[in-house]
Amino acid sequence: MQLNPSEISELIKSKIQNLQGASEVRTQGTVVSVTDGICRVHGLQDVMQGEMLEFPGNTFGMALNLERDSVGAVVLGEYEHISEGDIVKTTGRILEVPVGPELLGRVVNSLGQPIDGKGPINAKLTDKIEKVAPGVIWRQSVSQPVQTGLKCVDSMVPVGRGQRELIIGDRQTGKTAVAVDAIINQKGKGLFCVYVAIGQKASTIANVVRKLEEHGAMEYTIVVAAPASESAALQYLAPYAGCTMGEYFRDTGEDALIIYDDLTKQAWGYRQVSLLLRRPPGREAYPGDVFYLHSRLLERAARVSAAWVEKLSNGAIKGKTGSLTALPVIETQAGDVSAFVPTNVISITDGQIFLETDLFNAGIRPAINAGISVSRVGGAAQTKLIKKLGGGVRLALAQYRELAAFAQFASDLDEATRKQLERGRLVTELMKQPQYSPMSISEMAVTLYAADKGYFDDVEVKRALECEKAMIGYLKTNCADLMKTMESTADLSADSEKQLAAGIAAFKSSWV
């Protein structure tokens, strides 16, 4: 077989013409300086705000400052191996994290990578950490309750699905305890939970995870951890990553609860990053957009309509509304709620639960100040049963606080005032609750009904909780059907009320 040179050249030419080479255009630049996890990169022309950048050693960063001749980027993770002159490439993508039910029961970092030693997470989907909140048209009013299992919260500052309720107080006042109890109480209620721990000690986060595992709560919970040992950038990103994971459930017609513990540390992390990027400081050295930092995060918590769920699922899920409820935590310094970050978050949220050091030290736990704690939209979502019975509790506590201040100066009090003070002390005692022991609706209803109708009035204040426990135990044994009815209907009919009154009266006659 003889080869013809002209045929060979024609063959080569045709192969070259038909060559389909997938060319990839990527902008690249060089590192000019690297300090404290912040890199200045020169030569990146087509870079987006918030875009992921690829550094050597499979390390990623995020472009935050777009200047005329350089880009200020924050490194996500270790940065010791990055040096001046290294090549940095754009990716054309905004930062994404894995989402879906595969993450339930796992502990992940701010980038969605597992840190619990239980192997890789085989999530099928990823989503952007920065998303626009649903518009007004796509939202629905808050009308279904989130039962926290805490008497004082569910009766006086109720939380609804899709609400943002702030938990605010000094350090060591039980803020995390309220949030963790709320997660534990969601067992069997079809509510998925996301716990975002920001800037806490790793040992504290491990303790929370252990408690959730002990109470069987990890099976419906995702923990996003950005401990104090992590970089400021990862502490700043953690709430957005957790929110995206929670939004997956909201947008598939499910209900989710997210806890940010706490947003003060996130604001500190963002302040640190902003100052290192040489952004001009404002009040308390925070950057000018610290309000937007929290508002764009908390506005993503909402109750969305069935039309929104249908649109995002491309018509696969019909007739189901979804919700994402947020319980952000803010730590105050010496009770100063007029500081910059606390006032910002108070103005963004739909109410707040104030926890006070004085109450905590006096043994009133949860240390909730009922006078200044409010829920602006939760009242519409409160269960009928608790709404019907809880009104008297708030009134009794309000009158008690007013009289207690007056009684300090008055030596001789009339009988009516003395009774009211005694009743106030009793109700305050009954609002106490041990940690990790949330109550069901029916148990709460028994306490509220008995307190409202004066069944505890002849009980010593120090024995009130003992009496309450015995009463609930008695009714569970002897009036099991009534308790089941109250739990399932979440209402109290006239007939049920008669049975309840008879049951409590029978218990009181036997209790000493």
Curated annotation (Swiss-Prot):
ATP binds at G169, D170, R171, Q172, T173, G174, K175, T176. It is found in: Cell inner membrane. It catalyses: ATP + H2O + 4 H(+)(in) = ADP + phosphate + 5 H(+)(out). The keyword Methyltransferase does not apply. One of its GO terms (cellular component) is proton-transporting ATP synthase complex. Its EC number is 7.1.2.2. PROSITE patterns: ATPASE_ALPHA_BETA. The keyword Cell membrane applies. Keywords: ATP synthesis, ATP-binding, Cell inner membrane, Cell membrane, CF(1), Hydrogen ion transport, Ion transport, Membrane, Nucleotide-binding, Translocase, Transport. GO terms for molecular function: ADP binding; ATP binding; proton-transporting ATP synthase activity, rotational mechanism. It is a peripheral membrane protein. The record marks S373 as: Required for activity. F-type ATPases have 2 components, CF(1) - the catalytic core - and CF(0) - the membrane proton channel. CF(1) has five subunits: alpha(3), beta(3), gamma(1), delta(1), epsilon(1). CF(0) has three main subunits: a(1), b(2) and c(9-12). The alpha and beta chains form an alternating ring which encloses part of the gamma chain. CF(1) is attached to CF(0) by a central stalk formed by the gamma and epsilon chains, while a peripheral stalk is formed by the delta and b chains. Belongs to the ATPase alpha/beta chains family. PANTHER family: ATP SYNTHASE SUBUNIT ALPHA, MITOCHONDRIAL (PTHR48082:SF2). Produces ATP from ADP in the presence of a proton gradient across the membrane. The alpha chain is a regulatory subunit. This is ATP synthase subunit alpha.
